[in-house]
Amino acid sequence: MTGKRELRVKPIVNGTVIDHITSGQSLNVLKILGINAASRYVVSVLMNVPSGEMKGKDVVKIENRELDPEELDSIALIAPRATINIIRNYEVVGKHRVDPPREVSGLVRCGNPNCISNTNEPVTSRFTVERTGDDIQLRCSYCEYVIDQEIADHLL
């Protein structure tokens, strides 16, 4: 298939395409965005797609929805190489890479069972985001607990 492109999913008219998601993380991206079976958006998910620059990647297409910057940057917690494409009338009108936020609140559960954010107190979890290259770690603002692996397992 030299020189040919394979079309796996039809193009979208308007919406957002999240490309170069770390392989196996597309469902966690949907979780971060609050998209589930009850959502009204048409969503296409491609998993383990061959890619020249990555061993494999996932792709998410969300029709008729443009994501806000906070949502996009939260994706960087689990997919630091993701690229966001804004589509209007079948054309890419905006494209950028995600950039992790400096802090996340209410998105991740602290791994320390004794943390105040895991008790019956009305406290929202809050983490400082620390990045070294593609490696992301989260430090709890209350107890200093560090999550440096399997961040997706700690998503609320």
Curated annotation (Swiss-Prot):
Domain of life: Archaea
Free-text cofactor note: Binds 1 zinc ion per subunit.
KW NAD (keyword) present: no
UniProt: Zn(2+) binding residues: C110, C115, C140, C143
Keyword annotations from UniProtKB, A to Z: Metal-binding, Pyrimidine biosynthesis, Zinc
Gene3D superfamilies referenced in this protein's UniProt entry, alphabetically: Aspartate carbamoyltransferase regulatory subunit, C-terminal domain (2.30.30.20), Aspartate carbamoyltransferase regulatory subunit, N-terminal domain (3.30.70.140)
GO cellular component, one term: aspartate carbamoyltransferase complex
A single MF term (Gene Ontology): metal ion binding
UniProt record similarity statement: Belongs to the PyrI family.
UniProt subunit comment: Contains catalytic and regulatory chains.
Function in brief: Involved in allosteric regulation of aspartate carbamoyltransferase.
Identification of the protein by name: Aspartate carbamoyltransferase regulatory chain
Organism of provenance: Methanocella arvoryzae (strain DSM 22066 / NBRC 105507 / MRE50)
